[in-house]
Curated annotation (Swiss-Prot):
Similarity-based family: Belongs to the ChdC family. Type 1 subfamily.
GO-annotated molecular function: heme binding; metal ion binding; oxidoreductase activity, acting on the CH-CH group of donors, oxygen as acceptor; peroxidase activity
Protein name: Coproheme decarboxylase
Residues that bind Fe-coproporphyrin III: R131, Y145, P146, M147, D148, K149, H172, Q185, S223
Keyword Metal-binding: yes
Amino acid sequence: MNEAAKTLDGWYVLHDFRKIDWNSWKTVSASEREQMLNEFEALVSKWEGTEKAGKGSHALYSIVGQKADIMIMLLRPTMEELNEIENAFNKSGLAAYMIPTYSYVSVVELSNYLAGDSDEDPYENPYVRSRLYPELPRWKHVCFYPMDKRREGNDNWYMLPMEERKNLMRSHGMIGRGYAGVVKQIISGSVGFDDWEWGVTLFSDDVLQFKKLVYEMRFDEVSARYGEFGSFYVGNILEKERIPAYFHI
């Protein structure tokens, strides 16, 4: 049997996509809308407190296109906490005017493909910890997509020897490093959690960089031979102070 890559696992992640039922929302009185938005902002304030305590992170995004209107991205130490937050939101007044369109459950992951030899506990390394337990950047734009490694005929990633996979991932990673400071990415593993094997979340202040990065990686062997991709979602950061304006009728 081939050697499996070892992973370091951090916070659990929920990407929650919703459409807004604008027609129904328009029928609600201004005072009721205000009450529901106040309730939602109170939930977001609670999430902010968790983030300040270093026990999780979150961000809201306005999604472009018809796949969804809103994406809520949540990171927490346990799957139970994600479930509690999801249930609390579903019981809120605002959620009654939202239609779930997609969700993705995963855990922030670092693999040993690019790791060097060291006897230290990686969970005590500040750099590693910052990647496993990240505070989501408040950059202008987000791009999310799920992906698999292909398992077909001669293009079976899981049948390649470990050293070959390491070399391929090293080359693949060099492309990403070329976008350091321009694009931040969070890779989250979802084998056994969701329908794809990984979720990729990209952040940037220049939305065009998503296209440039993904296109350049298409020519790398890891993507060209072994990558399979799901739907792409792109959107813009929705800060708490902009929530009332976003839902204003």
